[in-house]
Amino acid sequence: MDAIDASQGAVFFAAGVFYYFKTEDVKRLFSAMSERFPGAALVFDSCNERGARLMRKTWLKEAGITDVSAFFSLEDEKELCEWSESFASVTAKSYMRGYRDIYKDVGLFHKLMIRFCDSLVKMKIVKIVFKE
């Protein structure tokens, strides 16, 4: 982390990364980042425990990845507020609807996928802003 010059701000983006880490390791990383990079933002994707189980049964198995023993999962982004007093805000948006909502522009199949991802596996894009 010391190699990163964040003197003019920083945004960290991690897509599909934290599923491979244990929750306690993710918690330590987020806390360390909040201390090292005040005012920065961290954006990442998440899903709930059901979604993590589905990943374990499907694409990780198909990819031959067997050494992933514990997955980071998130039922509600508000859980993260308890992780560090250095978090200024924690917000989330639908993973499938993202920052530009296309729901009204897609067909029935995609609308069903969006609803599945939003309600059953709670796929989200999460943003943490660290305190200055």
Q: For each predicted feature, which ranges?
A:
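Alpha-helical subdomain
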Residues: 1-132
